[in-house]
UniProtKB/Swiss-Prot annotation:
Residues 259-405 form the MATH domain. InterPro entries: MATH/TRAF_dom, TNF_rcpt-assoc_TRAF_met, TRAF-like, TRAF1-6_MATH_dom, TRAF1_MATH, TRAF_BIRC3-bd. The coiled coil domain mediates homo- and hetero-oligomerization. Keywords: Apoptosis, Coiled coil, Cytoplasm, Isopeptide bond, Phosphoprotein, Ubl conjugation. PANTHER family: TNF RECEPTOR ASSOCIATED FACTOR (PTHR10131), TNF RECEPTOR-ASSOCIATED FACTOR 1 (PTHR10131:SF96). Signal peptide: none annotated. This is TNF receptor-associated factor 1. It comes from Mus musculus (Mouse). Disruption phenotype: No visible phenotype. Mice have normal B-cell proliferation and antibody response, but increased T-cell proliferation in response to CD3 signaling. Their T-cells show enhanced activation of JNK and NF-kappa-B. Mice are highly susceptible to TNF-induced skin necrosis. Changing W264A: Decreased interaction with FBXL2. It is found in: Cytoplasm. One of its GO terms (molecular function) is zinc ion binding. The keyword Disulfide bond does not apply. The record marks D156, C157 as: Cleavage.
């Protein structure tokens, strides 16, 4: 109640006046509808005749009733804020005062808290009416806040203890509740984000697992292909060997003769002689030839640096009996006369030597391996005459040897 002096604690129980209006000409504090209903029900005589004569309309729960409702003659008078005693300087009509009190509760609490702190810091000061007025104002403000928040007509009017620690705790509680609400909102947002990230991580894990599985399948397929390539390479190598043998056989068949006469062309004579002297290639084998289509299989063996008694002095030329496909049908030992010729490419004077096989020699028996031991003429032709200018035994680094096997016998 905004007056010159604060009322006694027992003058108005619960911080509200005993009647809605006792002195219409004086601004009154707001009275909640709960107190108003209680006053109207308990004692109608306390309502002034002017208020009783007016038709009071029912008010909604939690709505404050002021003198503006019943005394129109003072509706426009300016009144001071009930918290003027603690520093609030607002003045205005009852309607604006109602709006001010509804919107300035926080500032009123801070004003009360400042006065309480100052009062608590001065324990020897007057403890009379000022603390009681502050306590009632605080009770009224808390009561109005409770009524507006709940809308309950049965809210009890109470007076909170004037205690700095409780007010500080209340403010801290409000701050913490606001902070908690903000944190809960952030937590909800983060929970949604985490849920989305979890789905993405799960999808990534599934994709990674699928990729690993596919990689394993690809690796196995690659190993299978590599094994297949190795097998194909081996098969190709075998076919190359077979093809090489066929080509060699074909070449031999093209070079071979089947009448007992064989002409052997030797190229790169200088190089071959040098290799023979160095021991790199001691001897040369000629392609095979035959005495007949189904006759003996033979070849020549030449030592360019000599062999045996003709080593380093003569060309040594031998005949080799080879194992043939038709040996079982042929007479043994081999007994045909053999003639060797080193051809003079100027057709002047050929070098000729001949011999008959030694029937007791193993060289002319039926071969038990691929070839028998070579036999022939170790002193076939002197090396000193090989490059003779009078003859063309070697021409264009090429020489020709001829073998004639007598097949008439």
């Amino acid at each position: 109640m905004a007056s010159s002096s604060a009322p006694d604690e027992n003058e108005f129980q619960f911080g509200c006046p005993p009647a809605p209006c006792q002195d219409p000409s004086e601004p009154r504090v707001l009275c909640c509808t709960a107190c108003l209903s209680e006053n109207l029900r308990d004692d109608e005589d306390r309502i002034c005749p002017k208020c009783r004569a007016d038709n009071l309309h029912p008010v909604s729960p939690g709505s404050p009733l002021t003198q503006e409702k019943v005394h129109s003659d003072v509706a426009e008078a300016e009144i001071m804020c009930p918290f003027a005693g603690v520093g609030c300087s607002f003045k205005g009509s009852p309607q604006s005062m109602q709006e001010h009190e509804a919107t300035s509760q926080s500032s009123h609490l801070y004003l009360l808290l400042a006065v309480l702190k100052e009062w608590k810091s001065s324990p020897g000061s007057n403890l009379g009416s000022a603390p009681m007025a502050l306590e009632r104002n605080l009770s009224e403000l808390q009561l109005q806040a409770a009524v507006e928040a709940t809308g309950d007509l049965e809210v009890d009017c109470y007076r909170a203890p004037c205690c700095e620690s409780q007010e500080e705790l209340a403010l801290q509680h409000l701050v913490k509740e606001k902070l908690l609400a903000q944190l809960e909102e952030k937590l909800r947002v983060f929970a949604n984000i985490v849920a989305v990230l979890n789905k993405e991580v799960e999808a990534s894990h599934l994709a990674l697992a699928a990729s690993i599985h596919q990689s394993q399948l690809d690796r196995e397929h690659i190993l299978s292909l590599e094994q297949r390539v190795v097998e194909l390479q081996q098969t190709l190598a075998q076919k190359d060997q077979v093809l090489g043998k066929l080509e060699h056989s074909l070449r031999l068949m093209e070079e071979a003769s089947f009448d007992g006469t064989f002409l052997w062309k030797i190229t790169n004579v200088t190089k071959r002689c040098h290799e023979s002297v160095c021991g790199r290639t001691v001897s040369l084998f000629s392609p095979a030839f035959y005495t007949a289509k189904y006759g003996y299989k033979l070849c020549l063996r030449l030592y360019l640096n000599g062999d045996g008694s003709g080593k380093k002095t003569h060309l040594s030329l031998f005949i080799v009996i080879m194992r043939g496909e038709y040996d079982a049908l042929l007479p043994w030992p081999f007994r045909n006369k053999v003639t060797f010729m080193l051809l003079d490419q100027n057709n002047r004077e050929h070098a000729i030597d001949a011999f008959r096989p030694d029937l007791s020699s193993a060289s002319f028996q039926r071969p038990q391996s691929e070839t028998n031991v070579a036999s022939g003429c170790p002193l076939f032709f002197p090396l000193s005459k090989l490059q003779s200018p009078k003859h063309a035994y070697v021409k264009d680094d090429t020489m020709f040897l001829k073998c004639i096997v007598d097949t008439s016998a």
